[in-house]
Amino acid sequence: MRVANIGDFNGDGVDDFAVGAANNGPNGTSDNGAAYVVFGASGGLPAGLTPGDLNGANGFTIPGASFGGSTGDLLGNAITGVGDMNGDGFDDLAVSAFYGDPNGVGGREGQAYILYGKAAPMSANVYPATLSANEVSIISGGNFDSEFVNDISSAGDVNGDGFDDLIVGAFRAADPNDYGSGSSYVVFGKASGFSATLDLS
């Protein structure tokens, strides 16, 4: 399980947090994964808040994908607040899916999602693949079975352009058969964000 302060994702003046649960899965699966975003509240949060209580107004769930059987994409293996990458005044969130597969065949390429903050309410369940380019950017670039995105981190504003940036770690980026062939990628924030998909290969 991973927990991260993500700043003020919904712009209400109170900081929010996110929980990544990469081995969570419904209906007997164990590794679809999920991430849960919980909006802070000026009066505090209720005791005993569960994922099922997140309704879009107080937070939301990002469900992971299944490739059949017990195989899933391990969404939530890394999660972080990334500041305001697109300069719209809302803090943003990045979450990785270690086995994320753009082709849906269990290839374990690995993906990450930048979800751009916005005012609540929103859907109780948020599926990155169904969102528009001003709501999400999907980062990929791995080879088959390369497990591309094993870690992500906020980088601050490393190029001094006024937009926050992101670092993506890929521990088998150069060769999916070599665990020592990793690379890191710095993704510079910019006005209006990126296209719906961002290929780092």
Where are these regions (language model features)?
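Conserved beta-strand/short-helix segments
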Residues: 1-201
